[in-house]
Amino acid sequence: MSYRVQVRVMPRGGLLDPQGQAVEHALSALGFPDASAVRVGRAIELEVAAESRREAEARVRQMCDKLLANPVTEDYLLEVGES
Amino acid sequence: MSYRVQVRVMPRGGLLDPQGQAVEHALSALGFPDASAVRVGRAIELEVAAESRREAEARVRQMCDKLLANPVTEDYLLEVGES
Amino acid sequence: MTSSTAAAVVTAASPFPGERPVTDAVVREHNLNEVEYGRILELLGRTPTLTELGVFSALWSEHCSYKHSKPVLQTFPTAGPQVVQGPGENAGVLRLPDGWAVAFKIESHNHPSAVEPYQGAATGVGGILRDVFTMGARPVAVLNSLRFGPLDQPRNRYLFAGVVRGVGDYGNCVGIPTLGGEVGFAPGYTGNPLVNAMCVGLLRESDLIRAAAHGVGNVLLCVGARTGRDGIHGASFASEELSERSEARRPQVQVGDPFTEKLLLEASLELITSGLIVAIQDMGAAGLTSSSAEMAARGGVGVEIDTGLVPTREAGMTPYEILLSESQERMLVVAEPYRVEEIQRVCAKWELGAEPIGHVTDDGIFRVRHHGLVVAAIPGQRLVDDCPIYQPAAREGEDARARRTAKPQRPARTDLQGALELLLDSPNLASKRWVYEQYDSTVQASTVLGPGGDAGVLQVPGTAFGLAVTVDCNNRLVALDPYEGGKAAVAEAARNIACTGAVPLGITDCLNFGNPEKPEVFFQFREACRGIADACRAFDTPVTGGNVSFYNESPAGAVDPTPTIGMVGLLARVADRVPSHFSTPGDEILLLGATRGGLGGSAYWTEVFDFIGGSPAPVDLAAERSLQRLLASAAGRGLLRSAHDASEGGLAVALAEAAMGDAYVESGFGAVADLGAYADGVPAEAILYGEDGARVVTSAAPSNVDALVSLAGEHGVPVHRAGRVGERGGALELRLGGRLFTWSIGALRRIYYTAIPRRMRHPDVDRSAGA
Amino acid sequence: MLTVAVVRFPGSNCDVDALRAVERVGVMAQFVWHRDTSLHGADIVILPGGFSYGDYLRSGAIARFSPVMQAVQRHAADGGPVLGICNGFQILCEAHLLPGALLRNAGLAFVSKPVDVVVERTATAFTSVFEPGVRLRLPVAHGDGRFVAAEDTLRMLEAEGRVVLRYVPATEESPLQPNPNGSANHIAGISNATGTVVGLMPHPERVADPLLGVPDGLGFFTSLAAWRPPVSTLSTPNP
Ligand SMILES: Nc1ncnc2c1ncn2[C@@H]1O[C@H](COP(=O)(O)OP(=O)(O)O)[C@@H](O)[C@H]1O
Ligand SMILES: [Mg+2]
C-alpha cells in the first residue's frame, strides 16, 4: 500500500516567530485586522510505502525525528491519508 | 466566534521543487527509500474572528489570494477548526 | 497549408503522433509572419511539422535571431589587442596580465520578472552565470541593474522586494559576490520592470573553450537538471492541446535551483579544465533547440538528437515540449564517444546526471528523432542564419523633441539648501544599502571594494592585480537625447572604473527598449547605439557582447530607453585602489574637470522642479578620456586618498556622498569647499546641481597636492582646489557667490541611508493591488 | 607538522577561502570530500560556509548526515579542534556538537555587511592569540543566523563562559545595527566546554588578507597555527 502523508512542522510555542509576525502585520495592513496568532512553519507532503496506516505513520515519525523537524526548535504533526 | 485555520501552501504541481527533491534524496540516503513524491511548502496557522465557519473560510481564502500564497507558483488548501 | 514554391523537398520529417497540423492560425500563434513562413517553406521544400515550426519560432524569435537589431549591432567596435573573444559566443573574453583572462556578459530577464519577480530574477542570475562558466571561466562577481515604477505604489514595492530577494538568494547560494549594480525608479517602468544581471568570470586564457560542435560521430550529452514543462513559450502559445491536458494553469514559470547550479558550475569547470570535452553550451532561452542548433552551426556540422533519451521530470513529454523547454540548470556537452564514462564519473561526483542524447553528423542537418521517428529535419546553417533581417523605420518622437526644448517652471521658492536633502531622499539617489546588504559581497575573499562606492574591485587571486567592475545607465538622459545618452552611459561607466584607479578595458551591453517596430523606439535604439559605439571607440573599450531586450512596453507605452553598460577595467596593483569616500581630516578637496552648469535631464529638475526635460549636457569624450588617464596615473603614484564621480545630483550630491562615508563608519566627515571662483558666470544652482560629465571629487593628503595639480596639468584636466576635509561628524559647508550653505553630516546620513528602508517597511504587502 | 582538513559538502562555497586563510599562516591544509569516511590524519577540521545541500529544509540539516560527519564526530570526541564558520556553525548545531540552533534572521532578509564583535572567550583553539575583550570588525553574510537555545542552555553557556564572540551594541551616531539577526544575548559564536569545537556566524577567513583591508580575521588562524595537541606533543615538541 502507498499512503500520502501530510506533515506540518511548526516553530515551538514561545519561540519568536518573525515570519509569523511579519505576516500578521502585513495582513493587518491589507485590511485583515481580524487575523491573529499567526505562525509560519513548513508543510511537507510525501508518499510512503507501508503495510498499514499505522506503519506508515510510524515510518514518517521516524523521518521527522531524524530529519524533517529540529527537536530543539520545532514540533510536528502528521496526517495520513490513502493515496 | 474565533476560528483556528490551518493553511498549507504548496508549490504547484509540475513546477520544479528543489527542496522536495533534496529532502527525498536525503531521506533515501538515511534509510527511508520508501518515501517518494516529496514536496515542501509552507504551513501557516492563524486565528480569525468570524460569524461562522463559512465566513472564516472565505476570509482566509481572501488572505491567501492576496498575500499568503503566490498565485503564479503555488496552490493552497485550508482547514478550519474551532478554537 | 500548401506551399506556393515548387522547390524539391530538402528533408523528410513526420508529425509526432497526436500533434496538431500546421495551419495559418498555428503559424500565427508561433509569432512567425508571412515572409518568415514563406522562407521556411522554401528552405524545407515542404510544410514543416509542428515540432519544426516550434524550432523555427524559437530560433527566429527576436531573442535568438536579433532580426531587428543585427545591422545596428554590427556598427559597434569589437576589436582591440585585449580582445580574446568578441561578440557571438556565450560571453566576451578580454586578456589580462600573466596568462589570465576575464569573461563577462550581461543579460536581461525583464518579462519573467514582471510575472514572478523572485523566480524571474533568480533564474536571470542563473542564466548569466552559466553563460560565463560555459566559457571555462570561474564566476567571481555578479552585478545587477534594476528599474521599477515609483515606490509609492504597492505593486512596485512588491516587485522590487521580490527581485532583490531573487537576485540575492541565487547568487548567495552559488557563492558569487555581488560587487555592484544600480537601481532606478520612474513611472515608465511600472508595468515593465527591468532586471539585468551581469556576471564576470576569471580563466586562464589557455583554458578558454568555445561552444562549437566538432567531430562527426562525437556524442551530445545532456548534463544537469531534468527537463520539465517550464517556460515553453508562455506568451506565444495558447495551444489547445496543452490546455486540454492541463488542469488549471500551465506551469510556465521557471524555478531556479541554485544548489544544482553550484554543482553544475563545479562539474563544468572540471570537465573543461581536464580536457574531457570538445564543447559545452548552456541551455538557456529556447533550451535544447538553440543550444544544439547554434553549436552545430558554429562548428559547420549537423546534429542528431533523440528527444526520447532526454531525462524528463514528467512522463509523456512530447518532442516539441522537450525541445522548447526552458528548464534551468542544464548544459549540452559535446565529447568524443570514448570519454562518456569518464564524463559521467565526474558528473556523478557532483551528484549530476550526464545522458547521451545524440551525436554530431556530417550532413549539416539539424535532425530530431523521438525513439526512431524523425520529427524534425532542417538544414542547420540556414535554420540559424536565414531568419529575415529587418531594417525598421526610425523617426524621433514628437514629444521627445518637445521635452528636450522645454524649460522648467520654476517652483515658487527655490530652496538651494533644501534641494540637497530632497535629492538624497529620492530613492533614485539615496543609498542602495537596503539592496546590497541582501547580497553577499565578500564571499570568495577577494573583494577589495564592495558595493557602496563607484566601481567594485576584486583581487585576482594569487596576483597583484585586480578587476574593477560596474554597470551604469542614466535612462533619463537617453530618453531626452538617445545619442548623447548612449555616450553618457559609457562615459559614466568608464568614470566609475577610473575613480578606483583602474583602466577601462571593454564593455558588454544590455539594450532595453520598447517595440522596435515603432519608428520612435527604433530611433532611440539606433541613436543610443551610435552613441555607445562612438564612446567605446574614443575610450578603446570594445564591445564584447551583450543582449537586446525589445518589447518592454507597459500599458502607458514604451519604457525609457535603457542601454545598460557593463564595464570591466584593470587595476594594475590592487594596493593602489582608491575608495570613493573621504577618510582623513585635513586632506585637501580637489575638483577635477570643468563645470558648465548643464541642468538638462538633471535629477535637480526632476526631483525638485518635478520636470523631466531639457537638453542633456553633451558628453565631451576627449575630456572624459583625459580624466580617465589622469585618475589611473594619480592612483598608480599614490596621490589620491579618494575619488568619486559627479553624476546624478551633480557636485553637491557627490561632495555629500564623499563626506558621509560608507554606511559602516561611525560617522562621516565634515567638509568645507569654496565653489565661488570655480565656474565663472554659472549660476549657483547649476554649480551645485548641474550634471556635466567628466568631473570627479577627490581628496588628497596636503603633501601630494602639488604633484596632483601638476599631473592634472600634464593631462589637460582643469583642477579646482576647493577646500578641506573636516572632523568626524562635522558639517558640509559649501560657499559660493557670497552665500554659505551648511548641512549637518549626521542629518544627511540619516536621510540618505534610510530613504529606501523607510519606504520598504512592508515590502511584501499587496502583491496584486495596483497591477 | 599540523594539518587542517577543510570539509567540502556539495554547496560549500567558502571552502577555498578557508583553505587560503589557513595557508596564509603557514599551515598545511587539504580538502576532504563529504563522502570520505576519514579525515586523512588531519589535526584540525574546518567546516566552511556556504549552502550545503542548498540549505534546503533547514540550514545544515542534510549535511549533518554526510559520511564524513561521523569522522568529524569522532575527531571532536577525541578532543580534536573543529571550527564551523557560518554554514559550518549551522551544521555543528544540527549535529549536536554545539547546543542551540540557528534560525531565520529576525529581519527575515539575508544580511551581508561588516559587524563589530567582541572576543569574549580566548581559551579556545581558534581565539588563543586575542586579548579578552578585543573588538573586531568581521563580515557576516547569512539568512539563518539567529542563535536560539533553551533558557537553561543559554544560562549554562553564559555561566561557563562559552560565548566566544558577541555582537557589539550600536552607538547613537552609527547606523550599524549591533545584532544583525536577533540572536539571543547577541551571541555571534560559541564553543563546547573545552574550547575545541567553535562555531561562528561571522567570516574571519574573508578578512585575513591585509591587501583587502584591516585583517581582523587573521587571529583566528594564527591561533589555529599555535594550537598543539594536549598530550602527545610532549614527546615530539614542535620547533
Ligand atoms: N542593485 C544593486 N546591487 C548592488 N549594488 C548596488 C545596486 N544598486 C546600487 N548599488 C551600489 O550602490 C552604489 C551607488 O550606486 P549608484 O548611485 O548607481 O552609483 P553611481 O552613480 O556611482 O553609478 C554603487 O556602489 C553601486 O554598486
Ligand atoms: Mg559613481
Q: Which residue ranges define each predicted feature?
A:
Chain D
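Glycine-rich nucleotide phosphate-binding loop and flanking beta-alpha elements
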Residues: S52-Y53, F89-I91, F147, T171
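N-terminal beta1-alpha1 cap of cysteine-dependent amidohydrolase-like domains
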Residues: M1-G84, C93-P99, L103-F110, V118, ...
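Amide-donor transfer/coupling interface in amidating biosynthetic enzymes
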Residues: Q73-A77, N105-P239
